[in-house]
């Protein structure tokens, strides 16, 4: 450490005289020196490298705290390690956030004095960063002046908002049948090719339009190809604007990265989202794809650290690890972080500890169905399998609850009659059942909706439908006010006025 100019060899006599005549100066100086001593970086050296695990020995008795970030200078830049265990004899065991190839024993390690910190703020919008906050989109450094540690406590009970509020998405099927809680956690179930990516993009777009909020997409164990495709699609649809302000920040911890990076990248994305909530009062949408891979990475890290596994080979701290992430996703009196988490269910076993632990935290589930997508109905949300704890008369109001229940009842009746229709035809049904089937088919098509982000592909302008309009429209259909309108007029429209306009247009074309 370089001492201040005051304390050089030539000025010791002057300093001694000043010290005797001014005790206050001496006290202040001692405090300054003590502070400087405490801020001196702790350095150590690598003693063992075992895959993603690196042991570091420190000469000083003072060791870096658990979760502190350590740095090693490498020819490629820097390698960040996170302290996981204190082994004794001044040695700590760390998890590497990148590959350890080429790392040798004896290399110098520097303690940063705090956890991994990442850039936050509007400068991150439209950019792709990795777990340690470095840009990976080849568009230069992120010019943010603010950085936040990825490890933080959840908001206190006093800060949290206790009222249950709906976060309007503008998507009819979601708002009506499985509404999202503001500051809630939603599980998104969907296989390949059912419109999951487009659904996510539309949510990002609608949150920006309806609430002026931002979104953070976190790829946990994401395939590099999928991440690249998502980035390119977002640029094409205008969600990411390279010239103006974008609506989303992307954080990727790719599938080929070490388990340490995949276990922490969700926290990096959450930290960026928390800044928009706490400092800018925004309603932020946080996407995590895939939450199972977060658990899987934690399991790998746990095994590398030598912990005894629990059921099915998962880490013994599974519930704690999940809770540390999920409890930070909440509503405060300033804003909210609403999370949509893609959930992979291993071998379709819902009792597997990983998805079972996730389900305990979810407020709603949105299920994308291949059967519905094959009918050409998009978004392909299954109205009978999707659920929400907010669909309660005390939260959404009696009218909304009654309409949603009647819609589900009508669709369920139609589903139970489909086998009879397939074998015997519509003629064998009673008049009441025929009417129910006709209305159910209209409702099924009315649950479709043109998306703004898909306009470049479909040529149909996107529609954002307000919740009160959605409830009123479906109530009118259930009451039979539009029984005279053909069912194809209900396909790919916004509100009920669009149905009427489309029906008039179709009638004019027919004449």
From Swiss-Prot:
Modified residues (Phosphothreonine): 112, 237
Alphabetical UniProt keywords: ATP synthesis, ATP-binding, CF(1), Hydrogen ion transport, Ion transport, Membrane, Mitochondrion, Mitochondrion inner membrane, Nucleotide-binding, Phosphoprotein, Transit peptide, Translocase, Transport
InterPro entries assigned to the protein according to its UniProt record, in alphabetical order: AAA+_ATPase (IPR003593), ATP-synt_VA_C (IPR055190), ATP_synth_F1_bsu (IPR005722), ATPase_a/bsu_AS (IPR020003), ATPase_alpha/beta_chains (IPR050053), ATPase_F1/V1/A1_a/bsu_N (IPR004100), ATPase_F1/V1/A1_a/bsu_N_sf (IPR036121), ATPase_F1/V1/A1_a/bsu_nucl-bd (IPR000194)
SMART domains referenced in this protein's UniProt entry, alphabetically: AAA
One Pfam family from the record: ATP-synt_ab
Transit peptide range per the UniProt entry: 1-33
Binding site for ATP: 190-197
Any one Gene Ontology BP term: proton motive force-driven mitochondrial ATP synthesis
Enzyme Commission identifier(s): 7.1.2.2
Catalytic activity: ATP + H2O + 4 H(+)(in) = ADP + phosphate + 5 H(+)(out)
Record PTM Phosphoserine, positions in chain: 373
Subunit note: F-type ATPases have 2 components, CF(1) - the catalytic core - and CF(0) - the membrane proton channel. CF(1) has five subunits: alpha(3), beta(3), gamma(1), delta(1), epsilon(1). CF(0) has three main subunits: a, b and c.
HAMAP family: ATP_synth_beta_bact
Note: Present with 164000 molecules/cell in log phase SD medium.
Function: Mitochondrial membrane ATP synthase (F(1)F(0) ATP synthase or Complex V) produces ATP from ADP in the presence of a proton gradient across the membrane which is generated by electron transport complexes of the respiratory chain. F-type ATPases consist of two structural domains, F(1) - containing the extramembraneous catalytic core, and F(0) - containing the membrane proton channel, linked together by a central stalk and a peripheral stalk. During catalysis, ATP synthesis in the catalytic domain of F(1) is coupled via a rotary mechanism of the central stalk subunits to proton translocation.
Family: Belongs to the ATPase alpha/beta chains family.
Protein name stated in the entry: ATP synthase subunit beta, mitochondrial
Organism: Saccharomyces cerevisiae (strain ATCC 204508 / S288c)
Lineage: Eukaryota, Fungi, Dikarya, Ascomycota, Saccharomycotina
């Amino acid at each position: 450490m370089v001492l201040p100019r005051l304390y050089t060899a030539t000025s010791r006599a002057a300093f001694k005289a000043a010290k005797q005549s001014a005790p206050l100066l001496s006290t202040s100086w001692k405090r300054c020196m003590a502070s400087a001593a405490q801020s001196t970086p702790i350095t150590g050296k690598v003693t063992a490298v075992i895959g993603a695990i690196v042991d570091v020995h420190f000469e000083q008795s003072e060791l870096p705290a658990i979760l502190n970030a350590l740095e090693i200078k490498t020819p490629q830049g820097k390698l960040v390690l996170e302290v996981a265990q204190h082994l004794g004899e001044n040695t700590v065991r760390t998890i590497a956030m990148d590959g350890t190839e080429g790392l040798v024993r004896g290399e110098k390690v520097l303690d940063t004095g705090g956890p991994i910190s990442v850039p936050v703020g509007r400068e991150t919008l439209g950019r792709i960063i990795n777990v340690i906050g470095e840009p990976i989109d080849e568009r230069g450094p992120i010019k943010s002046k603010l950085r936040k540690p990825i490890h933080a406590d959840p908001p206190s009970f006093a800060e949290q908002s206790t009222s249950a509020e709906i976060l309007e998405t503008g998507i009819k099927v979601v708002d009506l049948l499985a509404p999202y809680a503001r500051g809630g956690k939603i599980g998104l179930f969907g296989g390949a090719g059912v419109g999951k990516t487009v659904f996510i993009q539309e949510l990002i777009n609608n949150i920006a339009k309806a609430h002026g909020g931002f979104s953070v997409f976190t790829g946990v164990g994401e395939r590099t190809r999928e991440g690249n495709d998502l980035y390119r699609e977002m640029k094409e649809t205008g969600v990411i604007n390279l010239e103006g302000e974008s609506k989303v920040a992307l954080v990727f911890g790719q599938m080929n990265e070490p388990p340490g990076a995949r276990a922490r990248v969700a926290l990096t994305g959450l930290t960026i989202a928390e800044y928009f909530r706490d400092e800018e009062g925004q309603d932020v949408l946080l996407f995590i794809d895939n939450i199972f891979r977060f658990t899987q990475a934690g399991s790998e890290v746990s095994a590398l650290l030598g912990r005894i596994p629990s059921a099915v080979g998962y880490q013994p701290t599974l519930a704690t690890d999940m809770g540390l992430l999920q409890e930070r996703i909440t509503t405060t009196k300033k804003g909210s972080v609403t999370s949509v988490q893609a959930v992979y269910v291993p071998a379709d076993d819902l009792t597997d500890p990983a998805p079972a632990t996730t389900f305990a935290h979810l407020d709603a589930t949105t299920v994308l169905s291949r059967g519905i997508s094959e009918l050409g109905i998009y978004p392909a949300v299954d109205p009978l399998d999707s659920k929400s704890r907010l669909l309660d008369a005390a939260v959404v109001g009696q009218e909304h609850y009654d309409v949603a229940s009647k819609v589900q009842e009508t669709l369920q009746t139609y589903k139970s009659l489909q086998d009879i229709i397939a074998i015997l035809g519509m003629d064998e049904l009673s008049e009441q059942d025929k009417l129910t089937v006709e209305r159910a088919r209209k409702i099924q098509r009315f649950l479709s909706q043109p998306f703004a982000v898909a306009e470049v592909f479909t040529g149909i302008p996107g529609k954002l439908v307000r919740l009160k309009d959605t409830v009123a429209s479906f109530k009118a259909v259930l009451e039979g006010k539009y029984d005279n309108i053909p069912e194809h007029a209900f396909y790919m429209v916004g509100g009920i006025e669009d149905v009427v306009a489309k029906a008039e247009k179709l009638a004019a074309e027919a004449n």
